[in-house]
Amino acid sequence: MRLGLRLFLGFFLIVGLAAFFVMRVFVNEVKPGVRQAMESTLVDAANVLAVMAAEDMKAGRITDGKFVRDLAEARQRELGATIWQFPKRRVDYRITITDLRGIVVFDSEGRDLGRDNSRWNDVYRTLRGEYGARSSPVVPGDKTNTVMHVAAPVRDGDRLIGVLSLAQPNASIDPFIAASQRSIMRQGAWLIG
């Protein structure tokens, strides 16, 4: 084989490998990027919901007040949304509210009333005036099926009266991550050749 042809093929091999590795970096960055965006949205929503829950929490009617009724109504809605070709039919947030000891006083799914959440990072840190969040497996030990929890303080003026944790399954964004990764791979394959 002639030297010129070898150099030509070597150059394209190096460029192709470089493009492949750059493409892999992009693909691997999609998942954490989407999860960071989801966390940011959960922070906003948790803080809005914490403000909305404060009046009922302060009045001692967090289990049967307006906040809970409004949440129940929202969970019953048929959303009928299509987001980037993926259907969104229902609200998939889970909301828990704990008292100052970290004991669950409200759970939108009704599963964990009375449970001590004071050692979970989202509640623990928020009770100490810090930002609290965690991602935990749905089934202990199963790291493939996790839920992101973001907490916000429930306040009466400046006084902390509880912690609202907003949880969303990471699986709810998996279709978007997979679609983005496929798109990057497809475009990268076209670019490489």
List each model region and its residues.
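Juxtamembrane membrane-water interface segments immediately C-terminal to a transmembrane helix
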Residues: 25-53, 177-183
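A short beta-strand signature within small-molecule sensing/ligand-binding domains used
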Residues: 143-153
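Short beta->alpha transition motifs characteristic of CBS
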Residues: 107-111, 165-170
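Helix-start (N-cap) segments at beta->loop->alpha junctions
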Residues: 140, 155-157, 166-185
